[in-house]
Amino acid sequence: MDKKALLALVLSAAVLLIYQIFIYKTTPPPKPVNENKSNTVVVNPAAPVSPQTPADEPSSGSAANPETAAALPVDGTEKEQEITVDTPLYQAVFTTKGGALKSFALKNYRETLAVNSKPIELVDVKEAMPYPLGISFPASSVDVSPASFFKADVPAIDLKSTSESRRLTFVQTWPGKIKIEKIYTFNPGKYAIDLEIRTYNLSEVPLSQEIALFWNQYVDPSAKEDSYGHTGPVSYVAKDVEREKVTKMETPKSLGPDVSWGGFESKYFIAAMIPQNPSLTSLSLSKDSSNMVSTSLKGPKNIIPPGQAGFFTYKLFLGPKDYNILKAQGVGLENAIDFGSWLKWLAMPLLLSLKFLYNYVHNYGIAIIILTILIKILFWPLGNKSYKSMKEMQKLQPKMLELREKYKNDKARLSQETMALYKAYKVNPMGGCLPMIIQIPVFFGLYKALLYAIELRHSPFFLWIQDLSAKDPYYITPIIMGATMFLQQKMTPVSGDPTQAKIMLWMPVIFTFMFLNFPSGLVIYWLFNNILSIGQQYYINKQA
């Protein structure tokens, strides 16, 4: 491969890399809700409503018009109470206000590397904002306010020293209208939480009901946006991941049906609501003037006969974007890791290989180096073929220069004579290029795997590199990487074109500046790949 082909290859790789980093952030157009599909379901008679005191006896009268129903009254004398759920993985704080979630701190993940750093908090709401996991009943006979107070059946739950699951039940009754129960089930060793919502019709007329489960999150408009990760609403609709950029949320949007899950994500963590029946579930997104972003799952419309109950079942996942943990949920939640649509089939096995190596060396930096060596061994024959082809092309440079001078005014003849020269010396001009092109998808797959792997977050390597997911604080590895790239360029067969030679010499400088802010785990991969390539190039040159 001559210098021109190599230049085109390197520039193409650079363009792809820049595209992946700075441009590949767009979200596909949302799938609109199918308005023609019926979402109305008649609930089969369930367990009868439990006996009531005289004060709770149903009153006569027709149910309110679903389109004009107001929220049920809120008892202003109630005081908010907090219920703490403590497990080995997280500490959650629920509130009687809405039977919702007030705090969810992940014990195994910290905000920074500082010794006194706080655990990662998945809930962020400001004063007067409704908490996540609140419910409402839009277009129903009756609705509830997010400020409605529930009664909790226990003051706290401690699961740190047990393997048994526990329940937390919130209940509230509006006499003669409706009784609502929210039942959370916690498992000590899991991030997943089961949620069942039961609504009992206490009236004497059928109750038309359509439930919506919310995740509300405050997004600071002044916060610096992460160039490598998305923070905002995310959902899985009709087997496609939908991401909404918060800064572009101007009007409410609806997605679905066929919503497998929806929620809020950051680069490494996610809070997802998973409905029992995705085919009848739609999703709504909105942002208000106080920068509260709301994601709501809307279920099918139910008709609940008098004295009967409706049941709505969900699973909640609040935790890290660990591929194995997400995949175990069985609803495609692993797709929340942004490997990219055309790279995930390479990124996923590479990430799993990295985790496999870590089980033996217990250092992700070393695991990256070993994986780099294994990939280089896998592509060693292709690399040899590429370097040998470049060497053969270098030998033909004097003859090619003669042809260019001789036929400088006849491009057709120049092309014809050049191909004849290749044929005479049995040289394939693409022989050095194709083996390298085959390796490019593997590089980008590993790039994606390292960029979004939570395993690298706060994971130390050696000496000054204490977080493989963060940039090198002293820029030492990017500079060394640039030096190895410069050395590799010097060892590459030279071109007779001085302009191309100058451009190639600038490539290490460009890549060095690009890598200054890259996660150090990525830089380590590229650095050691360069070192191995230099060794292979030296071996080929010596053999020649």
From Swiss-Prot:
InterPro entries: Membr_insert_YidC, Membr_insert_YidC_N, YidC/ALB3/OXA1/COX18, YidC/Oxa/ALB_C, YidC_ALB_C, YidC_periplasmic_sf
Annotated compartments: Cell inner membrane
GO cellular component, one term: plasma membrane
Keywords: Cell inner membrane, Cell membrane, Chaperone, Membrane, Protein transport, Transmembrane, Transmembrane helix, Transport
A GO BP entry: protein insertion into membrane
Region (Disordered): 44-78
Highest taxon above the source species: Bacteria
Its membrane topology: Multi-pass membrane protein
Transmembrane segments: 4-24, 363-383, 434-454, 508-528
One Pfam family of this chain: YidC_periplas
Coiled coil, from the record: none
One MF term in the entry's GO annotations: membrane insertase activity
Function summary: Required for the insertion and/or proper folding and/or complex formation of integral membrane proteins into the membrane. Involved in integration of membrane proteins that insert both dependently and independently of the Sec translocase complex, as well as at least some lipoproteins. Aids folding of multispanning membrane proteins.
HAMAP family noted in UniProt: YidC_type1 (MF_01810)
Family: Belongs to the OXA1/ALB3/YidC family. Type 1 subfamily.
NCBIfam families named among the record's database cross-references: PRK01318.1-3, PRK01318.1-4, yidC_nterm, yidC_oxa1_cterm
Assembly and oligomerization: Interacts with the Sec translocase complex via SecD. Specifically interacts with transmembrane segments of nascent integral membrane proteins during membrane integration.
Protein name as annotated: Membrane protein insertase YidC
Gene from which the chain derives: yidC
